[in-house]
Structures are given as C-alpha cells and as structure tokens.
C-alpha cells in the first residue's frame, strides 16, 4: 500500500519544539487557566497569545475547537494552531476523540503545509476502550486519509499535489511509547487501506473492469507472504453452478469474475472470518435501465469490492494472527441482446431459483452465489459489503451505513467496531414479516420485495447465509461522496479493519 506521508511519534521533540523548523505547529490545550508545559512555552514565545485568547473568551478549549495565533521570531513554525481538548478531569468520549482527530487533521491540511508537529496534553478518557493509543489511531487514520489525492487519469500539468509530507506527534501520556506507536501505525495503515479503496472506486468504468479488480487483487497478494489469491472465470463459475452471478454480466462484453483472497495469519486449520464484496464495476441497471442523470456515479457500484480488497491488504500489513477470506463477486451490468430480462428465472449455486423482476437489483444476485461459495471455508462469521439500495440513503442519509444480521452478537461487534473506528453503522430489523415480500409465483424467491427496500434486499441475502453468522452492510450512502467532493470515501474499510483487529 502507498504511504502518502511520514507519520511518527517523537516524544523527544518536546525539548526543542520551538526551534524545529516546520510549516505548522498544532498545540492541544485543555480547558482552564493552567497550560501544560508545551503550551506554556508556546504562550511565552508568542507574547502570551494563548492566555490572551482564553482571557478574552475567544478560545475556550472546548473539544475540537480551533484557533490561529500569529507567529514571531520566538518560534520556527510558519503557522500555529490551537485545538481544544476539553476539561482535563472529565473523561473524553469516543466522539470527543473523533473531534480532536478531525481538528488536528484540518489544521495540518488547511494551508499548503509540508511538515507539521502536533503536541497533545494529558487527557482523561471516559472508558477503558478510549485511550491515548485510541486517539493516535484515529489521528493516524484521519491524517493519512486526508492526504489522499486522485490523479491517476490526469494530465501531468493538472496533477494534484499532496503537500503534507511529514508529521511528528508529541503527547503527554502515561501509556507506553510502544502502545502509542502501535496505535499511530495501526491508524495510518487503516488510512492507507481507505486510500486503496478510493483509488479503485475513482477509476472510470472503462478501466476498472472485473478483470482489473482481479489483476489488482493478484498484485496485492504478491506483496504479502501470507496472502494468496485465486480468480474464477465464467467457465469455472458455470461449472460451480453460479448462474445467478453470471446472469448479471450476460449483456456485457466484460467477463465476470469471482475473486477469492486468502490471508493465513492464524494457525493452520483455524476457521477464518470472511468478508464478501459486491463488485459491479458499472451498473446501467441492465434492461431495467437507470435514468441518465448521475449514471456516471454507477462506477462506484464496486465500492463493496474495493473495501474487501483494501481490508485484506490492511490485515496483511498489520500481520493479524487470524485467518481471513475476502471474496469479490464482480460483473458489469449492461443492456444488450444477451442481457437478462425482467421475468427471467435463474438457478443459484445453492440450488434455489430466483425470478429477476428488476435487473437493476443485481447486486444481491452476485452476492447470493458468493455467499454460497464461502460456505466451503466454514467461516466463523461472514460480513458482506455492498452499495445495495438507494433506500438506505432515504433511511440513514450519507453518514451512516445500514447493518442487518442474523446474529445479534455479530451485529453488536460490528456496531462497536464502527464506533471505535469513527465509521458508524445503524442496525435495521431483519424480521420474518419482511420475508414474505419476496414470494414469487414462478421461482423460489423474487429479487425485489416491498417498500422497505433495504430490509427486503437483506432478507434476500439472508436466504443464502443460513449456515453461518452473517451480517450485511449497505454502504450505498457512505462509500462515496456526492457533489463537488465526488469520489470514493474509503468506507467501510475502518469498520471492517477494526472488527478484524478486535477478533485477533
């Protein structure tokens, strides 16, 4: 994975902080009139700027609050920012740590800064799960992810520049330096994983095809000793009975692929955890054609696959001591003379038949066979990730992923991982009352149901995930940004990575 900047913990810097030539210095300040030693040094070097701001009520040190102070000959930093770290004796929540991490990142990247130092005071945390190590992990993820630029298809003169190159962190902490460094490294690796997912998502559909995803997966496997990759073509999938997956790509000249990545970090014979991604590299809707406006964004319909490929690299980089399988079901959904038609009936790998009432509900079709495929690994748990329904955006907007599961313990573990990683999800019901909406007169199951589109889509998938604890993440609203910021977000790589870290 590509490292976009050098991010390090350097406690020795506290001695020469003001003499170190840098572009930006970020100083954490707790609420109250008493400054910690570093903030006191900065205050004296800037003729009492910090205390003056506090006295005038212009800076209250509220969690996440920021302020700019002018520099002078007393410091070697071009710019100095203050960030609020809250009351020193009040425990900081996970949300508080998120605010601090984002404020740090914003201050480092607001101007064309190349080098920076971040100084953080001693902080008390609300729970055992929140520590200084946790904060540094969040900062590592946020800074690395923010340093992302996409320029793969830009002319040289239009290449975007990532200015930030080197950031050092000094923190007043009771935790060991080893733990703090571990947190920072883990966060940065997760941020790198997010950027891998962004790169794949942002490529145009004429470049990022199912074959391209297969090549990318093989390339990733070649970089890590414990990671392997196998790619199945259409002939092999046909032999395995994956007619449901294959039906989606019938109208396309691009060959559909099933990609199976295997990370062996645990003991031989230990059952793996599995993650499964929807990889529709371009989704026109097929015969059930989508309207033209925003159809260009349908290149993002492979973000589930991108998150799987990226997460497999994260766990390989972190050398987690568990076994993990990552599966990508990839196809291009196009209209054509051979395309699947509304009303067609296909047989799945499981033997169940599906009436395809809407060819634009194709993600669940490729996932159905992929979920059956992972049975062979006897997984401890399976999490599938898909930009599956527009309905989840109506329900949860663009900030929160939808989560449905056949196992309450697994659901809670994923929700907790999302809270830790600042990549949150919300659980929706998967009750039997919704299952009847998928009844068909002509097959075992229809591929669309009633008004609760996100839930009925998950109900469809649940029919193919009956042999293991399973959860579904609908990331249609969170995997990419809209408008001026259009592009892949890298989510839910942090959630998936944190879940697997917690399992290791």
Regions found by a protein language model. Give the residues of each.
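Short amphipathic alpha-helical segment within the helicase RecA-like ATPase core
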Residues: 1-279
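A generic structural signal for tightly packed, nonpolar segments enriched in small/aliphatic residues
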Residues: 58, 115, 197, 213-504
């Amino acid at each position: 994975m590509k490292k976009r900047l050098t991010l390090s913990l350097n406690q020795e810097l506290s001695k020469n902080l003001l003499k170190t030539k840098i572009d930006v210095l970020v100083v954490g300040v707790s609420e109250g009139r008493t400054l910690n030693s570093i903030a006191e040094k900065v205050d004296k070097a800037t003729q009492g700027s910090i205390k003056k701001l506090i006295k005038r009520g212009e800076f209250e040190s509220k969690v996440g609050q920021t302020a700019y102070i002018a520099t002078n000959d007393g410091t070697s930093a071009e710019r100095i920012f203050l960030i609020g770290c809250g009351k020193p004796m009040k425990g900081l929540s996970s949300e508080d740590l998120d605010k601090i991490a984002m404020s740090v990142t914003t201050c480092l990247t607001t101007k064309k800064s190349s080098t920076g130092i971040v100084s953080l005071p001693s902080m008390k945390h609300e729970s055992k799960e929140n520590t200084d190590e946790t904060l540094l992990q969040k900062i590592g993820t946020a800074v690395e992810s923010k340093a992302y630029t996409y320029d793969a298809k830009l002319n040289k003169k239009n290449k975007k520049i990532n200015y930030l190159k080197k950031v050092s962190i000094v923190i007043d902490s009771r935790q060991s330096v080893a733990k703090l460094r571990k947190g920072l490294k883990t966060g940065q690796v997760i941020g790198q994983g997010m950027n891998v997912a962004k790169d794949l998502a942002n490529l145009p559909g004429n470049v990022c095809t199912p074959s391209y995803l297969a090549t990318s997966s093989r390339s990733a496997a070649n970089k890590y000793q414990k990671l392997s990759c196998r790619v199945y073509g259409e002939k092999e999938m046909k032999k395995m009975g994956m007619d449901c997956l294959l039906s989606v790509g019938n109208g396309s000249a691009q060959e559909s692929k099933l990609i199976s990545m295997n990370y062996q970090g645990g003991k031989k014979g230990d059952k793996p955890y599995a993650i499964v991604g929807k990889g529709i590299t371009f989704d026109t809707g097929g015969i059930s054609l989508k309207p033209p406006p925003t159809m260009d964004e349908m290149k993002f319909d492979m973000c589930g696959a991108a998150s799987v490929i990226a997460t497999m690299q994260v766990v390989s980089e972190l050398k987690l001591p568990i076994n993990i399988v990552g599966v990508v079901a990839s196809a291009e959904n196009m209209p054509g003379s051979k395309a699947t038609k509304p009303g067609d009936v296909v047989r799945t790998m499981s033997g169940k038949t599906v009436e395809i009432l809407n060819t634009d509900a194709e993600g669940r079709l490729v996932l159905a066979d992929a979920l059956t495929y992972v049975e062979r690994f006897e997984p401890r748990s399976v999490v599938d990730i898909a930009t599956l329904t527009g309905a989840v955006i109506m329900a949860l907007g663009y900030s929160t992923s939808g989560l449905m599961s056949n196992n309450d313990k697994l659901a809670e573990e994923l929700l907790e991982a999302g809270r830790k990683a600042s990549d949150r999800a919300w659980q929706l019901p998967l009750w039997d009352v919704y299952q009847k909406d998928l009844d068909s007169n002509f097959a075992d199951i229809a591929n669309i149901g009633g008004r609760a589109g996100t839930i009925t889509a998950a109900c469809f998938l649940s029919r193919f995930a009956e042999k293991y604890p399973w959860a579904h993440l609908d990331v249609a609203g969170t995997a990419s940004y809209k408008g001026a910021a259009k592009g892949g977000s890298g989510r839910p790589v942090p959630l998936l990575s944190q879940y697997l870290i917690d399992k290791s």
